[in-house]
C-alpha cells in the first residue's frame, strides 16, 4: 500500500495557513505520491483561480521530488492541459484518475506523461462515451482503479459487499478490483492475463518502490 498526500479541489477552502508545510512533512515521511489534486468546475461555488494556484504549487512540489501525481478533473480539461503543458511535471508521469475527458485529448495528454485509470463506475450503462475512450488509451498508459469506497461497479458486477458500520449503508469494497479488471478487459477486447500483465508494468513505472532507492530524474518542463 502506497500512501498519497495532497489537497483535493473539493477541500481546498478548508486548508490551514500552514498547509504547504504540513504537506511537505507528510511527503518527507512517506515519499510515494502526491494526490489527489486537481481542478473541478462541477462542484458548487468553486473558485477556479484558487484551485489553479493550489494545483500548480502541488504539481511543482511533485516535480521537484519526482513523485507520481494522481489528478482529479471535472469540466476543466482545457485548463488542466495548459497547466500540465506549462509544467514542470514529474519525470515519471502522472495519473488521470477516472479519466472522463475527451477521447481526442488522450494522445496529447499521453505525450505529456499521462496514465489513464478506468474505474468500475464506467461499467454503468450510461457511461458509453467513457468506455469508448478507454478502448483507445495506449496500452502502455492504462491503469485500473476501484475508486473505493465511493463510486463503484454496477450492482450486478459487485462480488464483495461492504457496509458502513454506523449507517449500515452499502459502500464499495476494494476487493472488487478483480471484477474491474474483467470489465476493463471487456472494454479493451483483450485477454485478461495480457491486460493484467501490462497494467502491472505500467504501475511499476509510475509508482516505483521508493524504498528500493530508485534514483530520481529531472522534471519534465516542456
Residue ranges of predicted features:
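H/E-rich (His + Asp/Glu) clusters that bind or coordinate divalent metals
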Residues: 41-42, 103-104, 108-222
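Residue-level marker for buried hydrophobic side chains located in beta-strands
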Residues: 33, 69, 94, 142-144
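Short, cationic motifs built from Arg/Lys/His that form the positively charged side of catalytic pockets
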Residues: 58, 72-74, 146, 188
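Active-site gating/metal-coordination segments in enzymes
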Residues: 1-68, 111-115, 120-125
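Distinct, well-ordered alpha-helical segments
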Residues: 16, 23, 73-88, 95-98, ...
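Conserved, mostly hydrophobic/aromatic
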Residues: 3, 34-36, 62, 97, ...
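Short active-site oxyanion
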Residues: 66-69, 92-94, 115, 192
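Short, function-defining helix-loop hinge/capping sites that tune catalysis or transport
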Residues: 14, 44, 48, 80, ...
Amino acid at each position: 500500500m502506497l500512501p498519497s498526500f495532497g489537497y483535493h479541489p473539493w477541500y481546498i477552502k478548508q486548508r490551514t495557513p500552514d498547509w504547504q508545510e504540513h504537506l511537505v512533512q507528510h511527503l518527507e515521511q512517506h515519499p510515494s505520491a502526491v494526490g489527489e489534486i486537481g481542478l473541478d468546475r462541477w462542484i458548487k461555488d468553486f473558485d477556479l483561480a484558487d484551485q489553479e494556484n493550489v494545483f500548480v504549487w502541488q504539481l511543482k512540489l511533485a516535480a521537484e521530488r519526482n513523485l507520481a501525481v494522481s489528478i482529479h478533473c471535472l469540466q476543466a480539461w482545457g485548463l488542466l492541459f495548459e497547466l500540465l503543458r506549462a509544467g514542470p511535471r514529474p519525470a515519471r508521469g502522472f495519473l488521470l484518475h477516472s479519466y472522463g475527458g475527451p477521447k481526442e485529448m488522450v494522445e496529447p495528454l499521453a505525450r505529456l506523461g499521462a496514465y489513464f485509470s478506468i474505474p468500475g463506475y464506467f461499467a454503468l450503462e450510461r457511461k458509453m462515451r467513457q468506455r469508448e475512450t478507454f478502448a483507445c488509451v495506449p496500452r502502455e498508459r492504462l491503469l485500473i482503479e476501484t475508486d473505493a469506497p465511493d463510486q463503484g461497479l454496477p450492482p450486478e458486477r459487485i462480488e464483495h459487499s461492504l457496509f458502513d458500520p454506523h449507517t449500515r449503508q452499502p459502500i464499495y469494497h476494494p476487493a472488487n478490483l478483480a471484477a474491474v479488471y474483467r470489465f476493463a478487459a471487456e472494454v479493451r477486447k483483450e485477454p485478461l492475463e495480457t491486460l493484467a500483465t501490462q497494467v502491472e508494468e505500467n504501475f511499476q513505472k509510475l509508482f516505483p518502490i521508493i524504498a528500493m532507492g530508485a534514483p530520481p530524474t529531472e522534471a519534465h518542463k516542456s
